[in-house]
Every structure is written in C-alpha cells, then in structure tokens.
From Swiss-Prot:
In plastids the minimal PEP RNA polymerase catalytic core is composed of four subunits: alpha, beta, beta', and beta''. When a (nuclear-encoded) sigma factor is associated with the core the holoenzyme is formed, which can initiate transcription. Binds 1 Mg(2+) ion per subunit. This is DNA-directed RNA polymerase subunit beta'. GO terms for molecular function: DNA binding; DNA-directed RNA polymerase activity; magnesium ion binding; zinc ion binding. The keyword Hydrolase does not apply. GO terms for cellular component: chloroplast; DNA-directed RNA polymerase complex; mitochondrion.
C-alpha cells in the first residue's frame, strides 16, 4: 500500500470479508465475475491443463503463458480497445502471465470458521476480548458446547441461559430430536448457537470503548484491594495476574480502535486462496510432479466444505449431529491450513512428513519475510565476514578489492571510457578482469565520493544498517571499527555483513546526512550512548593502563619482596630505591621513542616530567623519602610522583611515575578532546 506521503509500505492485519472479496474477484470483459474456487482439483491428468474453477484455474488466476488462453489461442498483448481481451470459449483473458503471482482467489465457506491465530495462539485475542476461559471457547467452536442466544423481550421456548454441555444426559436424547423435528427450525436458530457462529455473535455485540472503560475501572479497584504487608501471597498473585490481563485487554481494544478493525473479522466466512505462483506444482525428471503442501491443505478444505454444502442443501433429511460434525471437520481443516499442529498433533502425509502450513511458510528464519523479502539478494550488493579494523575512523570501513571491483564495476567502466583508457564497454571489462593498475586508481577515485551501506541481519532497529566511507583493504574480509559493533549487535567471531551501494542521488544524500555511523552515537530507543567500548576493547584498555598501581610501594615496601619472614637480617643494599634504576624522561615523545627502540618495555615504570599542578603544590601529603644532592637540591619522593626542589625550597619540577601504556592512552584522549574542541569552534 502507499500512504499519503507516497511511501510504499506493508501492513499486516485483519480485513473485512468485503475487502477480501474485492481483492479476489475479477470481472471479465463479458461481465462474468470470477474468483471463487469451488473444485479441489489442480491439473487434468491427461492434458496437464488447469482444471476449471480449481486451484490453478486460468479464468480465476490468469493465463499460464502470456497471451495464450486455455484453448491454445494466441493474442498479442496490446493496449488497443478494439482487440479482443479474452477468449469467448474458455473465458481466459489475454494478459501477462505475471498476474498469477499476485492474483488471489477465495473459498466461500459453508459455515463460519474462527481464525486459529486469534483463538489458539497465546495469549488468545478472542478469549481476551470476551473475558472467557480459552477452554470454554474452544469447546464452543468445536461443537462440544452450545450457547444460549440472548432473546430480548421475547418469550423463550427452551429457557436456556449461558453455555451448556451437549453431552449432559438430559440433553443427549432430546436435542437431536429437537433439531430434526419439522417446524422447529425457527426456535432452534433463535435460541441455540454453537460453533464459530456463537463466537461471532458475541464479538459483534462488543463495544470496545466500554470494554476499555470497564477494564480501567476494575484495574483501579484491584489496585486498592492489595493485601497489606503481603499477608496473603496467593491473593496478591491472583490480583496481579488479573491486573496484567486487564492491561492486555485495554491495549488490544485500543489497537482495534486505532486500526479500524472490527472484532468479528476474527471469524472467517471467506478463505483467501494464495496466487498459484506462490504454491507451485513442478514437474521433475521422470514425469513426476512436486506440489507445495499448501495445495494439499487447500484441497482438504474444499473437499470438506463441499461435503458440508451438500449436507445443508438436503437439511431436511440430514441429522443435526452430522451437520455439527461436518462443521467441526471444516474448522479443523482451516486450522491445519493456517497453522498445522497448533497446540495439538500436526497433520502428516503418507511418508510421515509434517505438512508445511501457511504459518510455517512465513515465520522463522527461513520464512517468506526474513529469507525471501528481507534477506533476498539484490543488485549492487555483496557479503563477507567482518574483522576488526582498529586503525579505521569511526565513519570508515575496509572493503576488499575483490568486492569493490564488482560493486563499482559500472562506475569503473564509465571512468575508463571517460578518461579514454577504453573505447567501449568490452575493452573496459577486459581491463577490469586483468586488474590493470589504472583500474585501481580509478576505483580509489570512485570510492572517495561514494558511501556504502553495511547491514547485519536481523535488522531489528534502524542502527542495524549504517553508512560508511569505504577504503580498499587487502584480504577478503570487511574491516569494521569495533565501536560500531553494538548498533549491529555484531562481534568478530565469524559474523557476516552485507554491503550495499546506494545508487540514486536521494539515497546517497540520505546515507551521508542521516545514516553515517559517526552521526548515530546514541540509541534511538533510550538515548544512551551506543558507541561504547565492549569486550576485547575493554580488555585492551585494562592491559594498556594496568601498569603498577601501588607506585613505589610495590618494590620497596612490598612484604613479599622482603625476607623478614624468618627474622633474617636484611642487607642495606636491599633498601635501594629500585633493583633496576627507573629512567627519567622530559616529555612523552622521548618515552615513546625509547619504547620503540626497545630500551624499555610497555609496562616498565618510568618518571615523566609533568607540568606544575596546583593540587600537588597545595597538597599536605608527607613524602615517603627525601634524596639530597650535592648541589643543594633535593627530591621529595611520594607514592606516584616526585618533586624536585631548590635550596630555597622552591618547586622546580614535577615527575610522575607512569609507563608507556598510560602515556599512549593519555595522548589519544588529549588528541580526541582537542579535535572535538576545534570542531565545536568551527561550528560556532
């Protein structure tokens, strides 16, 4: 469907019988209305042609071959009004055969049938709206219980109230006699109801707004009845379950009102028939036919429905029990078609294989939506494993050359022809296959101004697909910055991602303005940061900054390093400041240079000259040691820093005790903050 903003969208929900009939019915040029499937047949066993009014009828669903009718006559498909549009002999229109992919049919049911999704799925929508136990409604639907219809201001013949069991001994012999007695049909139809008819009558009498009001009042009253101090835990649980039920009932009624859906639409009088191309019959080697399970389930419904029609046409001689039993069989056949085995034993074929119902076709990872529609293969797309690219910017991704050449091949051909490296498309493709150096140069130019979209299934929210600026990388895997993984719910243990190329200018503009990864830093649901370090990033940061958190205490005053456990005398040379002299550096560049030259290790403690800090100047911390020098200066050694003072006790310099990991992390943070400040100043 197309909304007011001309956006194509798909909405799934209940529809009225009138809308269902409008979708399935077609009016032929001679005025005949077709669309109802009345026969359970598919193809004729001799001619291999679709049976008329069957599940593959060409009058209902359109011709198998474009422009060829069932008689074999051929007409060119034109728009001229004078040309005959259908065959007068077989009634098949001369139209495109692609109509068989979307043209529906319908089965007119001889009795009302409840939709299994709304009755048997938990929570049951029908039981929720009617506020009745699910078992009672199922017994009513399948004919085990009858329902007394409310008769207003009229005398009642049977004086029944509510539902009553058909198996009660007092009714067991009288009800069949009553049903078959001539002249009592009026009383029977007025005062007794069973099956899906009883469900539909109760749903049609509902006022959704009154349901919402009464449910809200009851919910408020239950909130006041809570037992103090949890005296009766069982009653509290019972009240809690009832309150949760009322909340679900209010939300369901609100949804029905908002979407303009009537509750009685959950009971079917017409059963839609899928287009034939979505439930095909294929001929394999040896002349055998392979059919979709849906066809067999449709045939089962039509067989039982036609049997019920025959019984109803001879109602005067048909026992009422037989009619009720046949209605139950029709209900079960429709349940199997919609959801085989829902809360029961599934139907199987002769090879003990479970039939795939309509629910099995559309649900799950291999269903119609996730595999065929959302996960289908499209042009200008590729797929590969993702690996970590920590050196990438947040808005960049690494694209393997093999994938990039295929995705941007049309752009490469245009670039080669424009720059006169190829005279035609064939020569350009030849150069691309040979992967000449000029191809990589043009590919770099093309990729600089063209974003790509990365998607990881399942796409559960809008951050499941984001835009990136691609760069060429070696190998066959897509490189991704680790900070964007949380939005995709991805990790680097073999996950695969799809890459798409936006072609139109509108798509490229949307990708640049709205979908770039560095513009999607917050969760759209709760506005929390989505680009946060996780897993191996946290481990890396821990290792980078772990170092020695005890300062100089770890070497000098660590009891594990002292041999005083046996009251041994410790030599004075063990009280040196360190076993190995810790180096001093004037700036961070010298420290990193020493690490690169392998003069120190990554976590080796060192002293780094630092700017004067007011917190240290005003600190009243007592130094651990004081080292005096011959020139009169002295060093005050604290737990994590060292102060150099002159003879006049003036603070000359400060050294902090750190390592290369801390220095590297600090520099990264400092550069990021400075870059943010520059960007903020440009915006102002």
């Amino acid at each position: 469907m197309i909304d007011q903003y001309k956006h194509q969208q798909l909405r799934i929900g209940s529809v009225s019988p009138q809308q269902m009939s409008a979708w399935a019915k077609r009016i032929l040029p001679n005025g005949e209305i077709v669309g109802e499937v009345t026969k359970p047949y598919t193809f004729h066993y001799k001619t291999n042609k679709p049976e008329k009014d069957g599940l593959f009828c060409e009058r209902i669903f359109g011709p198998i071959k474009s422009g060829i009718c069932a008689c074999g006559n051929y007409r060119v498909i034109r728009d001229k009004k004078d040309d005959p549009k259908f065959c007068e002999q077989c009634g098949v229109e001369f139209i495109d055969s692609r109509i068989r992919r979307y043209q529906m049919g319908y089965i007119k049911l001889a009795c009302l049938v409840t939709h299994a999704w709304y009755l048997k799925r938990l929570p049951s929508y029908i039981a929720n709206l009617l506020d009745k136990p699910l078992k009672e409604l199922e017994s009513l639907v399948y004919g085990d219980v009858s329902f007394a219809r409310p008769v207003v201001k009229k005398p009642t013949f049977l004086r029944l109230r509510g539902s009553f069991e058909y198996e009660i001994q007092s009714w067991k012999h009288s009800i069949p006699l009553f049903f078959t007695t001539r002249g009592f049909d009026i009383f029977r139809n007025r005062e007794i109801s069973s099956g899906a008819v009883a469900i539909r009558e109760q749903l049609a009498d509902l006022d959704l707004r009154i349901i919402m009001d009464y449910s809200l009042i009851e919910w408020k009253e239950l909130g006041k009845e809570g037992s103090p101090d949890n005296e009766n835990e069982w009653e509290d649980r019972k009240v809690g379950r009832r309150k949760n039920f009322l909340v679900r009932r209010i939300e369901l009624a609100k949804h029905f009102i908002r979407t303009n859906i009537e509750p009685e639409w959950m009971v079917l009088c017409l059963l839609p028939v899928l287009p034939p191309e979505l439930r095909p019959i294929i001929q394999v080697d040896g002349g055998k036919l392979m059919s979709s399970d849906i066809n067999e389930l449709y045939r089962r419904v039509i067989y039982r429905n036609n049997t019920l029609i025959d019984l109803l046409t001879t109602s005067r001689s048909t026992p009422g029990e037989l009619v009720i039993c046949q209605e139950k069989l029709v209900q079960e056949a429709v349940d199997t078609l919609l959801d085989n085995g829902i809360r029961g034993q599934p139907m199987r074929d002769g090879h003990n294989k479970v039939y795939k119902s309509f629910s099995d076709i559309i649900e799950g990872k291999e269903g119609r939506f996730r595999e065929t529609l959302l996960g289908k293969r499209v042009d200008y797309s590729g797929r590969s494993v993702i690996i970590v690219g920590p050196s990438l910017s947040l808005h960049r991704c690494g694209l393997p050359g093999e994938i990039a050449i295929e995705l941007f091949q049309t752009f490469l051909i245009r670039g080669l022809i424009r720059k006169h490296f190829a005279s035609n498309i064939g020569i350009a493709k030849s150069k691309i296959r040979q992967k000449e150096p000029i191809v990589w140069e043009i590919l770099q130019e093309v990729m600089q101004g063209h974003p790509v979209l990365l998607n990881r299934a399942p796409t559960l929210h809008r951050l499941g697909i984001q835009a990136f600026q691609p760069i060429l990388v070696e190998g066959r895997a897509i490189c991704l910055h680790p900070l964007v993984c949380k939005g995709f719910n991805a990790d680097f243990d073999g996950d695969q991602m799809a890459v798409h190329v936006p072609l139109s200018l509108e798509a490229q503009a949307e990708a640049r303005l709205l979908m770039f990864s560095h513009t999607n830093l917050l969760s759209p649901a709760i506005a929390d940061p989505i680009s946060v370090p996780t897993q191996d990033m946290l481990i890396g940061l821990y290792i980078l900054t772990s170092g020695n958190r005890r300062g100089i205490y770890s070497n000098r005053y660590n009891p594990r390093n002292c041999r005083n456990l046996k009251n041994e005398r410790i030599p004075n040379n063990n009280y040196k400041y360190t076993k190995k002299k810790e180096p001093f550096f004037c700036n961070s560049y010298d420290a990193i240079g020493a690490y690169q030259q392998k003069r120190i290790t990554f976590d080796s403690p060192l002293w780094l000259r630092w700017r004067l800090d007011l917190r240290i100047i005003s600190s009243r911390e007592v130094p651990i040691e004081v080292h005096y020098e011959s020139l009169g200066t002295y060093h005050e050694i604290y737990g994590h820093y060292l102060v150099v003072r002159s003879i006049k006790k003036q603070m000359r310099s400060i050294y902090i005790r750190t390592n290369v990991g801390h220095i590297s992390f600090y520099r990264e943070i400092e550069e990021a903050v400075q870059g943010f400040c520059r960007a903020y100043s440009y915006d102002i």
